[in-house]
């Protein structure tokens, strides 16, 4: 079994929460992650619910400052955006990065501030899943470089996108979510599964179900990436690690940490235990792991870089 690829989530949300809006430190972290051998750099998305830097704009800067690491969204809400503009942005990003971008997407969690975000963007909440699916179909059609006419939520007549993406067909699309319907959609239509709420045992079962759905759809299930989005607070003092994780989750989401720990997979504790926890995901089939650190980014990056060869 090949070792998993390891990614690093840039702290765009944390920077805004603390009033440190400058982009220079974020770009320095991206460069540092690549120097340490991280395989990918990830950027979150939210307009008003959990404000942060615009992901596509920042991705372009990261692409210009790196040469090897993949760069992706964890995760973008395509339902909030016009898919013709989105296809144009991602084709350009794929060109800037020379084929290193990954389009991680989700339909959005059902919480009040995200519903408010959809209202602020003029998008009906109930339409989010249909908009996401149609937007991705339209993006792929435009990425082909062929003339596109489309009749649906959006109307397109004889449109040709240029430039086309660096990779024929466009960047891979990874989808969050772990419901039965969500994993069926991944298996039938997309290039990767990118959940954030499954322990290793549940992850293995759900990944197998996704691959079954792919085979049933006549697809090569091995061509679909099993990924995971995990949150870490590494500290040799387990109580201190727990306290830091709780403070991080409460400030990030504005909700009680015990509630968030039930929704998202987190680990707080010593480095050796963190290594074993990540290794359990690798054993469960995770091929690409995106790590979100609860503070102390440089120190935790160094720790993970030190033990990743043991995963």
Predicted regions and their residues:
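Alpha-helix-loop-beta-strand connector modules within alpha/beta enzyme cores
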Residues: 53-76, 131-138, 302-311
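Short, acidic/polar
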Residues: 20-33, 86-89, 175-185, 244-245, ...
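Hydrophobic faces of well-ordered beta-strands that scaffold small-molecule active sites
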Residues: 6-10, 41-43, 70-74, 101-105, ...
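Conserved, mostly hydrophobic/aromatic
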Residues: 33, 37, 45, 62, ...
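N-terminal small/glycine-rich loop or linker at the start of catalytic domains
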Residues: 1-18, 110-116, 151-171, 238-265
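N-terminal beta1-alpha1-beta2 module of alpha/beta enzyme domains
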Residues: 1-65, 126, 171, 294
């Amino acid at each position: 079994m090949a070792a998993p690829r390891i990614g690093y989530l840039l702290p765009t949300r944390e920077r805004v929460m603390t009033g440190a809006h400058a982009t220079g430190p974020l770009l320095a972290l991206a460069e540092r992650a690549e120097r340490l051998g991280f395989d990918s750099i990830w950027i979150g998305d939210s307009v008003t619910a959990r404000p942060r830097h615009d992901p596509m704009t920042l991705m372009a800067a990261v692409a210009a400052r790196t040469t090897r690491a993949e760069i992706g969204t964890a995760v973008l809400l395509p339902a909030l955006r016009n898919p013709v503009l989105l296809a144009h942005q991602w084709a350009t990003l794929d060109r800037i990065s020379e084929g290193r971008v990954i389009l991680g997407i989700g339909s959005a969690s059902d919480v009040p501030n995200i519903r408010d975000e959809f209202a602020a963007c003029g998008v009906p909440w109930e339409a989010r899943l249909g908009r996401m699916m149609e937007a991705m179909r339209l993006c792929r059609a435009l990425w082909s470089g062929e003339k596109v006419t489309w009749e649906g939520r959006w109307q397109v007549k004889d449109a040709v996108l240029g430039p086309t993406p660096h990779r024929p067909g466009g960047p891979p699309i990874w989808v969050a979510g772990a419901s039965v319907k969500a994993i069926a959609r991944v298996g039938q239509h997309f290039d990767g599964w990118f959940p954030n709420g499954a322990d290793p045992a549940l992850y293995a079962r759900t990944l197998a179900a996704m691959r079954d759905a792919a085979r049933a759809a006549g697809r090569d299930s091995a061509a679909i990436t099993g990924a995971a989005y995990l949150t870490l607070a590494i500290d040799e003092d387990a109580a201190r690690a727990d306290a830091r994780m709780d403070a991080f989750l409460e400030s990030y989401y504005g909700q009680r940490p015990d509630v968030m720990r039930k929704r998202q997979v987190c680990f707080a504790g010593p480095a050796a235990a963190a290594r074993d926890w990540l290794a359990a995901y690798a054993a469960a089939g995770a091929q690409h792991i995106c790590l979100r650190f609860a503070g102390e980014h440089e120190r935790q990056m160094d720790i993970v870089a030190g033990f990743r060869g043991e995963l």
